[in-house]
Amino acid sequence: MDKVYEAALLLDFYGQLLTKRQFEILDLYLNNDYSLGEIAEHLNISRQGVYDNIKRGRAMLDRMEEKLGLVHKFLQQKNRALEILKDIKSIDISSMSVEDAKILKRVEERIEEIVES
């Protein structure tokens, strides 16, 4: 998995457990693609301060994931839903009743919504 995507997921899951400053800096860095210099200028702190906060915040996120495993569980569930969706799409609906085909289509759409959220 892409390191930036993984870090952004960790921030989504555990970000509110960080200090406000760490969350703000990591959010600007990961979700808004700010550079260290841009964050430093925006928050009136040194680049070293930004770097240290990113390092500490990321370490905290990693420790939380190691203990709780919520992102790992989320990704497993998403992959399972994708497998189910693939199986549903492979079903031949030509021999189904119109009503059964509509139900299957609704199930497919709901699973797609789950995967995309």
UniProtKB/Swiss-Prot annotation:
Quote any Pfam family the record assigns. Answer: UPF0122
Enumerate the Gene3D superfamilies for this protein: Winged helix-like DNA-binding domain superfamily/Winged helix DNA-binding domain
Lineage: superkingdom? Bacteria
Q: Which InterPro entries match?
A: RNA_pol_sigma_r3/r4-like, UPF0122, UPF0122_fam_protein, WH-like_DNA-bd_sf
Q: What does this protein do?
A: Might take part in the signal recognition particle (SRP) pathway. This is inferred from the conservation of its genetic proximity to ftsY/ffh. May be a regulatory protein.
What family classification does the UniProt entry report for this protein?
Answer: Belongs to the UPF0122 family.
- The protein in question is named UPF0122 protein Cthe_0771
